[in-house]
């Protein structure tokens, strides 16, 4: 325990409920022979009276929440008058001790190799501990009730080699979102291994599968999860539209720059405003965007097609949504913009799967796949020391798997 000059620990109580420890309450009292100090000048002063008992959160002991209890004294300082005494474990009126605030702040930024240093052990010991923790969780996790999964690929490492991609399978039910499986490469064989790892009972019980338009995934899902409603992720479609608009902008910018620098200025600093949703563009970017839309440039027509397509997701009827999709593809094919025509051909080729999004509305967590992908990117950025797939796999399960944990009396974070 931490020692504080002028104070002693009087009593320690363990509060239990239903046979389990709930909290540790430590009563603190002032030392009998030492005066309290003014909280402003820190000089000793005679006592005046006592305030009601307060409670501060301290560093947990053995995984049990720990609190200090103390009734602060007021002292009569010659310079500052009657004032609350200086409390060495506290800062102002905060209900958390300074030790606990430092503890939380350090753990909030701590990485795995720093954990090894903090507990005076090796990186290998930390890694093996996490590996055991993940293996225990995978062996004891329950997969009953999984009805919706998302399948996606994630780029990992440097370069675009096949080994630098991961295939991930998520549970995306509204009630639960977690990582179920991760494998190396983005091939049919990889996805087959992932579905096999889930087990035949889980695969047969699936009602919805969400994926992008990667052909190997589409083929495996159709062959092995045919009973489930296959939905194409709307965020991947939006990404294709944004890429098409950016291709039109870059091609037109090159063409205008060849004519004159002044003409090319019309598209300068417009990349990100063009890729954002129109309703979210504000200020000077909005003014430049409005000036562009008033022109007859190809980029303005491409942006208009992209914004028009956003209305597609607002439909509730599959029939009306299908009619809008046909109308939009008709416009795109006659826009004389090859990137937009390419998107239109892609949407027509996958129209049944795109319309399944409306049939599954409310049944799966929309945007869950992209949200979990973002969390994976956070883990990869934070884990610069993970240079092998095995270490990366352990890190992803540990952070996103929502795995059960073995019982332990020591839970510090």
Give each language-model segment a name.
Residues 165-166, 242-254:
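Short, surface-exposed amphipathic charged segments that create phosphate/polyanion-binding patches used
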Residues 84-87, 175-181, 355-356:
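Short small-residue beta-strand/loop micro-motif enriched in glycine and branched aliphatics
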Residues 35, 40, 46, 160-163, ...:
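Acidic/histidine-rich catalytic cores and adjacent linkers
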């Amino acid at each position: 325990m931490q020692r504080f000059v002028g104070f002693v620990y009087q009593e320690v109580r363990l509060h239990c409920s239903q046979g389990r420890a709930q909290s540790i309450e430590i009563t603190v009292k002032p030392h009998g022979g030492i005066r309290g100090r003014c909280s402003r000048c820190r000089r000793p002063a005679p006592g005046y009276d006592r305030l009601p008992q307060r409670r501060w959160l301290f560093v947990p002991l053995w995984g049990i929440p720990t609190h200090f209890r103390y009734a602060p004294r007021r002292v009569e300082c010659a310079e500052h008058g009657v004032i609350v005494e200086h409390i060495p474990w506290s800062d102002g009126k905060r209900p958390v001790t300074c030790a606990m605030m430092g503890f939380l702040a350090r753990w909030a930024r701590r990485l795995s190799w720093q954990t090894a240093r903090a507990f005076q052990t090796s990186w290998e010991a930390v890694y093996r501990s996490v590996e055991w923790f993940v293996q225990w969780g995978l062996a004891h996790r329950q997969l009953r009730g999984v009805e919706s999964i998302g399948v996606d690929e994630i780029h990992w490492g440097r370069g675009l080699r096949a080994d630098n991609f991961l295939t991930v399978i998520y549970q995306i039910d509204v009630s639960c979102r977690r990582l179920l499986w991760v494998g190396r490469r983005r091939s049919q064989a990889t996805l087959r291994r992932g579905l096999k790892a889930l087990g035949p009972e889980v695969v047969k019980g699936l009602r919805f599968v969400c994926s992008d338009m990667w052909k190997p995934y589409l083929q495996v899902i159709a062959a092995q999860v045919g009973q489930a409603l296959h939905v194409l992720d709307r965020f991947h479609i939006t990404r294709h539209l944004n890429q098409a608009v950016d291709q039109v902008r870059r091609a037109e910018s090159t063409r205008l720059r060849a004519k004159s620098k002044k003409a090319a200025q019309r598209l300068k600093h417009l990349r990100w405003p063009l890729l954002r949703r129109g309703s979210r563009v504000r200020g000077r970017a909005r003014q430049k965007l409005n000036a562009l839309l008033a022109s007859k440039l190809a980029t303005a027509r491409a942006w208009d097609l992209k914004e028009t397509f956003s209305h597609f997701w607002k439909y509730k009827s599959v029939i009306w949504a299908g009619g809008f999709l046909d109308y939009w593809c008709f416009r795109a094919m006659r826009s004389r913009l090859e990137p937009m025509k390419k998107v239109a051909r892609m949407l027509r080729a996958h129209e049944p799967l795109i319309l399944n999004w409306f049939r599954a509305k409310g049944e799966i967590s929309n945007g869950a796949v992209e949200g979990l992908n973002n969390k994976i990117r956070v883990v990869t950025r934070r884990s610069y020391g993970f240079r092998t797939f095995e270490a990366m796999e352990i890190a992803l399960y540990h952070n996103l798997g929502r795995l059960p944990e073995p019982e332990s009396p020591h839970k510090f974070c």
